[in-house]
UniProtKB/Swiss-Prot annotation:
The organism of origin for this protein: Pectobacterium atrosepticum (strain SCRI 1043 / ATCC BAA-672) (Erwinia carotovora subsp. atroseptica)
Protein name (record): Phosphoadenosine 5'-phosphosulfate reductase
Name of the gene this protein is made from: cysH
SUPFAM superfamilies from the UniProt entry: Adenine nucleotide alpha hydrolases-like (SSF52402)
Alphabetized UniProt keyword annotations: Cytoplasm, Oxidoreductase
Molecular function, one GO term: phosphoadenylyl-sulfate reductase (thioredoxin) activity
EC number: 1.8.4.8
Catalytic machinery residues: 239 (nucleophile)
Length: 244
């Protein structure tokens, strides 16, 4: 179908890409998450990949997509600063769901980065953005290239933050199709899916964390805080992977 010609869509300006995909996004909004995944696998170009931060609700998209494509490469960008509980969660889900896990890291180790640049996350928005570029964006770009990705699944939800509030199910990002099957799910739907499928939240959920990233830029939720304020000292919501 011409509307899913990735090369042709990549040649368009961003606003024209959005317009070209508007009709199909309207149709996708009417489907269930499972139906959306089926549609993507049938209509969008491979190779398919799924990214996961192994955060609070990570089990959902991992389970949802691997039920239909068990061997899909699962991309984790490991900064080296994840919580011990996150690494344990990764191991547990990889075993439980038999994930085809691909771990990507920055070219420079965490210790080497600190010796060269200091603690970038303590250097304001500019430092955080450089840190994210080194540890998230570049490794993800490398993963998409090495895995020859044509379609990238991710587990973002509109309810998570204002920056995600207008995201469509289907878009173009980093030169590939970006597909968000649970974009319209609320917290109740998340809970129900986890319960019905014998899946767990991230271990730190029970300790008051609403969102989990690196140890140095993640805070427990406290009364009066938004979920966005628990990450990057409230200066940013996105780590760079889902921007652009």
């Amino acid at each position: 179908m011409a509307e899913f010609n990735l090369e042709a869509l990549n040649a368009l300006p961003k606003d024209e890409q959005v317009a070209a995909l508007a009709a199909v996004n309207g149709q996708l909004e009417q489907l269930s998450a499972q139906e959306r995944v089926s549609w993507a696998l049938e209509n969008l170009p491979g190779d398919f990949v799924l990214s996961s931060s192994f955060g609070i609700q990570a089990a959902i998209s991992l389970h949802l997509v691997t039920q239909q494509r068990p061997d899909i490469p699962v991309i984790l960008t490991d900064t080296g600063y994840l919580f011990p509980e996150t690494y344990q969660f990764i191991d547990a889900l990889t075993e439980q769901l038999k994930l085809n896990l691909h771990v990507y890291r920055a070219a420079e180790s965490p210790a080497w980065q600190e010796s060269r640049y200091g603690k970038l996350w303590d250097q304001g928005v500019e430092g955080i953005e450089r840190y994210n570029l080194l540890n998230k964006v570049e490794p993800m770009n490398r993963a998409l290239s090495e895995l020859n990705a044509g379609t990238w699944f991710a587990g973002l939800r509109r309810e998570q933050s204002g920056s995600r509030g207008e995201l469509p199910v289907l878009a173009i990002q980093r030169g590939v199709f970006k597909f968000l099957p649970i974009i319209d799910w609320d917290n109740r739907t998340v809970y129900q899916y986890l319960k019905e499928n014998g899946l767990s939240y991230h271990p730190l959920w029970d300790q008051g964390y609403l969102s989990v990233g690196d140890t140095h830029t993640t805070r427990k939720w406290e009364p009066g805080m938004s979920e966005e304020e628990t990450r990057f000292f409230g200066l940013k919501r996105e780590c760079g992977l889902h921007e652009g």
